[in-house]
Amino acid sequence: MARKHTFPSLKRAEILECIDGLGIPFTAKELDQPTSKAVIPLYEEFLDLFMGLTRQNLEEKVNSLQDSVENFEIIHESLRFTVFYQILSQFMQNICFHDFTIQDLLKPDRNRLQLILSAVINFAKLREERLQQFDDDIQKRESLLETYTLLDAQRKDLEEKVLLSQDRKLESEAIIKQNEERNEEMFQSLIEDKRLCSQVRTEYDRIRMEASELKIRYHNVDSLMASTLEEIEKLQSSIVHSPEKLKGKIADTSLRIQNDRSQQVELDKKSKILHTKLNSLQLIEGDLNACLKVLEECLVELDKLEHATVLLSTNQELCDQIEINKKKLEFRKEQLLKQLSNAQEKLEHEQHSRNQKLEAAKQRMDNIREEYKVITQERNKKIQETEKKNAMIEMTEQKIAGMREELESQISSITMEFEKLKSHVELYIAELLRNLRSSNS
């Protein structure tokens, strides 16, 4: 027994026109002589158009079964066909075509294909008519998705900045630690150099004092030698003729000369020592200048250290601010996700309510069709009776006239009843649409 469907069957020309309007390539020959190779791509286009399931999405669903299925490469095509059939069957159930079978894919029949395409086209028309009722929800959903995408991109950007700041912070801390260690070493070296400088200055002052004393003594010796030479010249003028006295004076003079010579040798030695110490002092003075230059470099490094410390503090504040912004963005993201979830739940609830009301309306239409069928059968019976009475018109003309009037009155009452039922149905559908609009708003 053929299953009854709630949608009207469309004509061949109308089906081809609607499919062409959807932008799907499908010829009249493929509709009249359908094959599996022709209908499977057509159904794939329907899934892509109405469910957003592309061939790539289908491959991803099949590939997700790779870990749970043995010999995946061998049965890949069979798995793909099975998954495709399951999704397509679910789609057919949703558009009220409940007797879709695998034969419709493998060995499609012309009449069933025409019926299936009628179901899809009627669903597309109904979807297009009802789509305006959900425009606000769709726009809100798209707006929320765009906001979520933007916030997610900002969150990733901030995370990258935080990671970069943390890396810079670690590098700055390592550089600061190295600078602190180097500054500590240089500070200790400066303290030692300062101590050595003070010792060298003390030694230098002592040597200068000794040099000045030696210069004074040297001048004294020179003056003494000059006076001695003068005395010798005086003595030469007054030569002593007594040998004993002469020998005594000679001995005294020799002794004085030897003493002067020894003093001169000592003075020469001290002068050489002083020259050596002066050279050492000059070298020490060069070392002191180098130490002063190192000290200036240390001061520059200390300034750099202070600048790096200020920069580190600024980066730390920036990192803290970024963390605060990150937490705010995460909180905002959770709020948006909750709003999106609530909107989706509301949309699903509205769709479920709409489906229930549509099912009720379809059931009512089925009942009306059954009643109309019964009325039509009764009308056919009356017509048959009328034909029999027309055959006997010569015998019972008056009786036939009366029955004809009675039949016409019954037909008019039936027509009026049908019109009433039709007006009730239209009123019910209008009330249903108004309730749907009020529930959506």
Curated annotation (Swiss-Prot):
InterPro entries: Kinetochore_Nuf2_N (IPR005549), Nuf2_DHR10-like (IPR041112), Nuf2_N_sf (IPR038275)
S-S bridge residues: none
GO MF annotation, one: protein-containing complex binding
Function according to Swiss-Prot or TrEMBL: Acts as a component of the NMS (Ndc80-MIND-Spc7) super complex which has a role in kinetochore function during late meiotic prophase and throughout the mitotic cell cycle. Acts as a component of the essential kinetochore-associated NDC80 complex, which is required for chromosome segregation and spindle checkpoint activity.
Keyword annotations: Cell cycle, Cell division, Centromere, Chromosome, Coiled coil, Cytoplasm, Cytoskeleton, Kinetochore, Meiosis, Mitosis, Nucleus, Phosphoprotein
Family: Belongs to the NUF2 family.
Residue intervals passing through the bilayer: none
Compartment(s) where it occurs, according to its Swiss-Prot or TrEMBL record: Nucleus; Chromosome, Centromere, Kinetochore; Cytoplasm, Cytoskeleton, Microtubule organizing center, Spindle pole body
Modified residues (Phosphoserine): S143, S242
Coiled coil: 51-80, 128-186, 316-426
Gene this chain is encoded by: nuf2
GO cellular component, one term: nucleus
Protein name: Kinetochore protein nuf2
Chief site of localization: nucleus
Subunit text: Component of the NDC80 complex, which consists of ndc80, nuf2, spc24 and spc25. Can self-associate. Component of the NMS super complex which consists of mis12, mis13, mis14, ndc80, nnf1, nuf2, sos7, spc7, spc24 and spc25.
Alphabetical GO biological process terms: attachment of mitotic spindle microtubules to kinetochore; attachment of spindle microtubules to kinetochore; cell division; chromosome segregation; initial meiotic spindle pole body separation; initial mitotic spindle pole body separation; kinetochore organization; meiotic centromere clustering
